[in-house]
UniProtKB/Swiss-Prot annotation:
Entry protein name: Probable chorismate pyruvate-lyase
Task performed by this protein: Removes the pyruvyl group from chorismate, with concomitant aromatization of the ring, to provide 4-hydroxybenzoate (4HB) for the ubiquinone pathway.
GO cellular component, one term: cytosol
Subcellular compartments: Cytoplasm
Enzyme Commission number(s) from the entry: 4.1.3.40
GO biological process per UniProt: pyruvate biosynthetic process; ubiquinone biosynthetic process
Species whose genome carries this gene: Ralstonia nicotianae (strain ATCC BAA-1114 / GMI1000) (Ralstonia solanacearum)
Molecular-function GO term, any one: chorismate lyase activity
Signal peptide interval: none
Amino acid sequence: MSGAAMSYPRSPWRGALPPMAVYGQHWARWAVGVNSLTARLRAASSSFRVELLGQGRALPLRDEWRCLGLPRAAETLAREVLLICDEAPVVYAHTIVHPRSVAADWPFLRALGTQPLGHALFADPRVARGAFEFALLDGRHPLVKRAHAALGGTPPGAMARLPARRSVFRRGVSAMLVTEVFLPALAVFDPPPMM
């Protein structure tokens, strides 16, 4: 995680799925599930685990801070993990929340460690999920660079694009932005029926 605000030429995020010819039907089936992605990944694999890459204070990306309702870029608590199915990293997940709201509305976050965030969010009836936004992120996007660094590889060229989705969770008066980048290894796992 970087302590400096990251910029990217323009926001790739859209409220509708990209066309199937671009996004791919397989990826779309993973992206549109309304329930916990963690539960769906567990159902699609024989083993599942979370690898915590880092958690700490960081400035949000340029297209993120407004999602939290912040008037300007301000330090957030950021959490980055890999979701791993059958020992293959299949999702890079990036979460940000304003630090002041952690104690009041997201008290579990600081001690979550390698436990899945999705389980905590979907088990709490006071948490509401907002609409999804979707993107195809190319190799220049900071989250793709971080995902490839976590995998120990070199960032792909600007033409390599990874499907991603994000949504805002609300509890009380605070917001949490969760972004999930689908990694190539997810291609071998069939999404379970809509859960």
